[in-house]
């Protein structure tokens, strides 16, 4: 299993959130999630300007096996999307925590970040899933 970056927060549904220096939140799916899905063939991105709600579907990733909603870890407004994923969805498979980010949110309430799992708690969740 790959290393879980220490600067990320997670949802139990395997999305990650990186708090940027400008207060925005970058969102993607975990390396564990992309591994379960297999080779990704399509990503449905949210629109810039869309309002997303914590825990609601904001994007969709599709593999040869299944389509899966990507839930937003925070509420706010989408300010940027990774349009490169339209042509290269496999970027998520190759670099889930880096170039494979999906969208960026201007967060409504920073307190929501306190409800997310830290990397150690997320690693524990993955271990529990395997047993």
From Swiss-Prot:
Record PTM N6-lipoyllysine, positions in chain: 65
Coiled coil: none
UniProt keyword ATP-binding, yes or no: no
Domain Lipoyl-binding positions: 24-106
Stored SUPFAM superfamilies: Single hybrid motif
Pfam family, one: GCV_H
Biological role: The glycine cleavage system catalyzes the degradation of glycine. The H protein shuttles the methylamine group of glycine from the P protein to the T protein.
Family of this protein: Belongs to the GcvH family.
Protein's UniProt name: Glycine cleavage system H protein
Native organism: Xanthomonas oryzae pv. oryzae (strain KACC10331 / KXO85)
